[in-house]
Design a protein with these regions (language model features):
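Internal mixed beta-strand/loop scaffold within catalytic domains of large alpha/beta enzymes
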Residues: 1-34, 38-40
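Charged, compositionally biased interaction regions
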Residues: 45-142
Length: 142
């Protein structure tokens, strides 16, 4: 999990802005340049999830565990529909897809969430397979 910027290129393509020193780049290296890498882009959700996504955690502590610690309860997760990834169950939207092996596009320029300005650079492209709206149902009894 991490917080990465995405640039919409069309109805089914998103540029994924991750730098070489981020975990997403490590995952892409593990998958290899010839293989698709599944992605799940989560939008919204509880503040502990967003905070854990940007926190520089040690490798032996997952972002999901840290979000649960911050929230004082286990984080509920659910499996994606189009791949084997797991996402927090309390996010608002999930965009599922995969990276296109070896394909990059020019992404940017943008200001990032740390307040810095990023110039145009080549970054991976994801193909969107589905967009899911998560609805939590609340029941009150009197």
């Amino acid at each position: 999990m991490g917080m990465y910027r995405g640039q919409i290129f069309g109805k089914k393509e998103i540029g994924l802005h991750w730098q070489a020193h981020k975990h997403a780049a490590d995952h892409a290296d593990d998958v290899g340049k010839e293989n698709r890498m599944p992605v799940a882009i989560c939008l919204g959700g509880p503040p502990p999830v967003m905070f854990s996504a940007i926190s520089p955690l040690p490798d032996n502590l997952s972002e999901y565990e840290f979000a649960g610690l911050l929230n004082k309860r286990r984080l509920r997760i659910t499996k994606c529909l189009t791949n084997d990834l797991w996402v927090p169950a309390e996010v608002d939207f999930v965009i599922e897809g995969y990276t296109i092996p070896g394909e990059t596009r020019t992404e940017g320029p943008f200001g990032d969430h740390f307040g810095y300005y990023c110039l145009e650079e080549e970054y991976p492209v994801a193909v969107v397979l589905t967009v899911l709206l998560f609805v939590l149902l609340f029941c009150t009894c009197s």
